[in-house]
Swiss-Prot record:
CDD domains: Ubl_Urm1 (cd01764). Pathway: tRNA modification; 5-methoxycarbonylmethyl-2-thiouridine-tRNA biosynthesis. It is found in: Cytoplasm. C-terminal thiocarboxylation occurs in 2 steps, it is first acyl-adenylated (-COAMP) via the hesA/moeB/thiF part of the MOCS3 homolog, then thiocarboxylated (-COSH) via the rhodanese domain of the MOCS3 homolog. There is a cross-link at G109 (Glycyl lysine isopeptide (Gly-Lys) (interchain with K-? in acceptor proteins)). It comes from the Eukaryota. InterPro entries: Beta-grasp_dom_sf, Mopterin_synth/thiamin_S_b, Urm1. Keywords: Cytoplasm, Isopeptide bond, tRNA processing, Ubl conjugation pathway. The keyword Ubl conjugation does not apply. Its main location: cytoplasm. It comes from Aedes aegypti (Yellowfever mosquito). This is Ubiquitin-related modifier 1 homolog. The modification 1-thioglycine is found at G109. Belongs to the URM1 family.
Length: 109
C-alpha cells in the first residue's frame, strides 16, 4: 500500500453504494442497497466501513456477517465488480462512487 497518500477530506455529498445479495440482505432488514455517506471523512478503509455497517445498519446477528475484523467465510465481497482479494481486502481505501457488494454463498438445504 502507498504510504504517501494525501489525506484530504472527502468532499461533501460523496457516497458509496453498499449492496447485499444471496441472503445477506436479511441481516440488514431485508434492504438490498444502501447509499452510505462519506462526507467529511478522511481516508476510510473497508475495515472501518465494516464496523460502521455493523454499528449503523446491521439488524441481524453480527456473527453471521463479521468474524473479528473481516467478513465471515462464505460471504463474497466485490469492489466495483472486482473480487476484494485483488483490491487489498479490508485495507482497500474507499473512493467516492465505489460499489461494494456482499454476496452470501451459504444456502440452507
Amino acid at each position: 500500500m502507498d504510504d504517501t497518500i494525501d489525506e484530504e477530506v472527502i468532499s461533501a455529498g460523496a457516497t458509496i453504494t453498499v449492496e447485499f445479495s444471496g441472503g445477506a440482505e436479511t441481516l440488514f432488514g431485508g434492504v438490498k442497497e444502501h447509499v452510505v455517506p462519506l462526507d467529511g471523512s478522511k481516508i476510510v478503509l473497508l475495515e472501518e466501513m465494516l464496523r460502521w455497517l455493523r454499528d449503523n445498519l446491521l439488524t441481524g446477528d453480527p456473527n453471521l456477517f463479521l468474524q473479528e475484523n473481516t467478513v465471515r467465510p462464505g460471504i463474497l465481497v466485490m469492489i466495483n465488480d472486482t473480487d476484494w482479494d485483488l483490491m487489498g481486502e479490508t485495507d482497500y481505501i474507499l473512493q467516492p462512487g465505489d460499489h461494494i457488494l456482499f454476496i452470501s454463498t451459504l444456502h440452507g438445504g
